[in-house]
């Protein structure tokens, strides 16, 4: 992995953990997710239009199909992630979701894209899996405060991460969709898919905006930015390297969960997160 790709991924990781912290702190909800999707689409529309005007890409049905598939997977991802945060702690949900995603992604990259991880990469995958298990601690504790349900949502979120990562890799690397345009189209599709559900809760839209408009706008800026950086790295870097390396955000989220959100058992959680980061480093170097 080049230094430029690694710098993009590290910057994206910090930004990604930051907007997840804001989502957890805000309380979330379907209307909240819809509002920041709408805001993201509006904020990044001028940049997307400028890139399309400048590059004049020749989009066909395959390009639009990849955009729609990514939008669908991202929509399910955000809804599952939000449900997980409302069920359990940030420092449980975030690392398990982000830790399981790369494992599934690497497996699919081997089976579907013909990538071949080394022994060091396999060791990294095992560290990530072990760290995710250690993070949950005593299985009996998972039944407290909804954490068992939160782990389920986190694992489903990991499946969605693998799905949209592979789709977006194909979109930006094989079909040459500009990264910002791919992300913007995904956000637009998410707005379209979520609007019917949001309208059934129209009485919540105004109060949710008034209660959390600063968090909504911040997430609307940070969420696309973090993924645009990742998509840019994926243009010239194998996905089996990018997907695991970006999970350095796990450690950042664990720090936020234990220190900013006062979630307990900091030593165990941070040690488990550190093991997962070690696994990510092995995957990146392998």
What are these regions (language model features)?
Residues 216, 236-243, 257-286:
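C-terminal structured domain segments across diverse proteins
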Residues 1-69, 76-88, 137-155, 185-221, ...:
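Membrane-interface interhelical linkers
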Residues 1-6, 43, 49-63, 105-121, ...:
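Helix-coil boundary and interhelical linker segments in multi-pass alpha-helical membrane proteins
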Residues 69-74, 85-132, 181-189, 239-259:
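Specific alpha-helical transmembrane segments that line the substrate/conduction pathway
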Residues 148-181:
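Selected transmembrane alpha-helices and immediately adjacent juxtamembrane segments
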Residues 13-17, 45, 71-79, 99-107, ...:
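Hydrophobic/small/kink-forming positions within alpha-helical transmembrane segments
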Residues 44, 106-110, 119-139, 268-285:
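Hydrophobic transmembrane alpha-helices of multi-pass small-molecule transport proteins
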Residues 49-54, 111-112, 134-138, 175, ...:
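Helix-loop junctions at the membrane-solvent interface of multi-pass transporters
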């Amino acid at each position: 992995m080049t230094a430029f790709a690694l710098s993009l991924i590290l910057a994206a990781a910090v930004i990604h953990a930051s907007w997840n912290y804001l989502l957890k702190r805000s309380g979330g909800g379907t209307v909240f997710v819809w509002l920041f999707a709408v805001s993201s689409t509006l904020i990044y529309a001028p940049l997307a239009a400028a890139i399309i005007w400048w590059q004049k890409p020749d989009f066909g049905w395959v390009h639009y199909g990849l955009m729609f598939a990514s939008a669908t997977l991202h929509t399910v991802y955000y809804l599952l992630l939000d449900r997980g945060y409302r069920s359990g702690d940030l420092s449980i949900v975030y690392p398990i979701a982000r830790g399981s995603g790369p494992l599934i992604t690497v497996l699919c990259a081997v089976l579907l894209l013909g990538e071949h991880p080394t022994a060091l990469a396999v060791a990294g995958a095992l560290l990530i899996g072990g760290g995710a298990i250690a993070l949950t601690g005593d299985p009996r504790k998972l039944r407290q405060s909804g954490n068992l349900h939160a782990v389920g949502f986190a694992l489903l979120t990991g499946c969605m991460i693998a799905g949209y990562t592979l789709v977006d890799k194909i979109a930006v690397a094989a079909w040459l969709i500009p990264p910002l345009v791919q992300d913007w189209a995904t956000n637009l599709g998410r707005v379209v898919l979520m609007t019917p559900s949001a309208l059934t809760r129209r009485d919540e839209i105004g109060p949710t905006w008034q209660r959390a408009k600063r968090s909504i706008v911040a997430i609307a800026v940070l969420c696309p930015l973090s993924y645009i950086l990742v998509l840019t790295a994926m243009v010239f870097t194998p996905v089996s390297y990018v997907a695991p390396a970006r999970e350095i955000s796990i450690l950042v989220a664990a720090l936020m969960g234990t220190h900013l959100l006062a979630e307990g058992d900091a030593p165990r959680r941070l040690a488990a997160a550190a093991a997962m980061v070690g696994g990510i480093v092995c995957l990146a170097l392998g």
